[in-house]
Amino acid sequence: MAISRLIPLAVLAAVFAGPALAEEFDLDALIKAAQAEEGINVVDSTGKIVDMAESFSKKYGVKAVGTKSKATAQLEAVVREAQSGNVQGDVVMISDVPAAMGQLMPEGFAISWVPPDLAGDIDPKAQNPLLVVSSPNVLTYNTQLYKECPIKNLWDLTDPEWKGKLAMQDPLGKPSYTDWFNQMRSHADDKIAAAYEAKFGKKLETDTPSATEAFVAALAANGPLLTDSDSAAADAVAANGQTEPFVGLVSAAKFRDNAEGKLTLGLCSDVDPFIGFLNSTVGLIVKGTNSPNAAKLFIHYAMTAEGIAPQGEDGKVSSNRTVQLPADEPSGISKHLGEVLAYDPSTGMDDWDNRQDWQDIWRLSYKR
């Protein structure tokens, strides 16, 4: 069957397309072309993708099926399907930006596309590749045990007082944490050094090449409680009946459990130099899709307030600066976005290349 194609996917095949340039763009023409194509499969690591796909289908009359799949499984599937010529996933939303940049894009297995009509609203740093949404991972405390966050400086987490009392996912199994370490070194090492001086009243003296490496080594040496999930970390901090004074580093999405009475999480604020970091999700069109226009239309939809709304409920932040979080989002992170370290994909390949080094630093420094 002949397939109407507004713009062949091959035209988009620059490995890193860069921020969208001003160009003629006709959304109505894209919709019409998408409606003439086969349906699409869209994959994300959150179950909210099911709701997004259903709403997209109703809005545009283009069939879309959403599937939840972990980032590692998505990466493997894209490579396998591209090599076999049997593409099943048309759009992938991967919450491991460095891996997507390191494994998929250089080989041309998947392509980043920024909707030209929305480019002016999207943070320029989030366009190469396109970061659709970001999940805040933030310092938390138990509001039943503390009137306010007991942490005022990231270096507080290295104090004997907090030995074994920080709950977080294991960096050896959660790449977003080693990426955070590398992002700090690449973009905020001076702030880490300044925070040390602010806390201890003297400049940091270290044999390590950077302040961030000194911080990570000290943090690991203080024996955080390492978990295999956000849920386990959040429970350690603020589950009902918890009497141990833990603090945690968890996803803002866990604050949903406050409303259900399962947790009593509080959001830390005014921590020097930041309260956490953003873990971003990249949106890519898979090479070989039979429905390139439908795939592009879904990317466009995901970059609108209507399209990303289901994920906004979990505190996930759109890269479209005109899109606001819901007023009733449980964590209250919208008031503190300036206090988190945003992900900068300009050093994404460096994050990818240095994961093993950061894991080695953590492994060699960790003491329980």
PLM features: residue spans?
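Bacterial N-terminal signal peptides that target proteins for export
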Residues: 1-8
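Sec/Tat signal peptide C-region and signal peptidase I cleavage site
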Residues: 17-22
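Short, polar/charged alpha-helical segment
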Residues: 26-35, 45-63
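Extracytoplasmic ligand-binding site segments that recognize negatively charged/polar headgroups
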Residues: 43-54, 67-79, 87-238
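A ligand-binding cleft/hinge motif common to bilobed small-molecule-binding domains
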Residues: 98-103, 238, 243-266
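Periplasmic-binding protein-like
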Residues: 121-122, 134-137, 213-219, 261-287
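Mature extracytoplasmic/periplasmic domains
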Residues: 281-347
